[in-house]
């Protein structure tokens, strides 16, 4: 099974989340979460931090990531590990390939004309909002 990760990054004030604008198909020109492939022998959390550092310049001193959920596409042989975190300070983003953009947390992440993944980004962010509200962290 091929493994991937996606990372939901919230600004410290929780008003915006970080998106990248895809430059390749599938979903070319659409917003997506930061993430990438997980090497088979590597730990998922370490791979999430590695991808985040490579694609944004955000590192473990800037954010603590939480392993939140998996999405599995059994017939496609694909598994996606979902992580999230809240920045503990303002950061200077450095784009690797894809343009990075902060998006208002109240945007419609289910908009399939704007966001990649057939509504998965909306589902992921709504589930994280529930988790944060359960921890008395209000968005």
Name what the model sees in each region.
Residues 59-69:
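A short coil-to-beta-strand element that immediately follows conserved catalytic motifs
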């Amino acid at each position: 099974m091929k493994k991937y990760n996606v990372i939901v990054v919230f600004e410290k004030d929780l008003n915006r989340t970080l998106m990248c604008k895809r430059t390749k198909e599938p979903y070319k020109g659409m917003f997506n979460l930061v993430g990438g492939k997980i090497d088979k022998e590597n730990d998922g959390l370490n791979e999430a931090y590695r991808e985040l550092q490579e694609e944004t310049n955000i590192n473990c001193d800037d954010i603590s990531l939480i392993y939140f959920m998996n999405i599995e596409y059994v017939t496609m042989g694909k598994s996606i590990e979902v992580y999230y975190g809240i920045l503990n300070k303002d950061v200077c983003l450095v784009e690797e390939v894809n343009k990075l953009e902060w998006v208002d947390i109240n945007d419609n992440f289910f908009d399939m004309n704007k966001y990649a993944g057939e509504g998965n980004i909306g589902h992921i962010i709504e589930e994280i909002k529930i988790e944060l509200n359960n921890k008395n962290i209000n968005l």
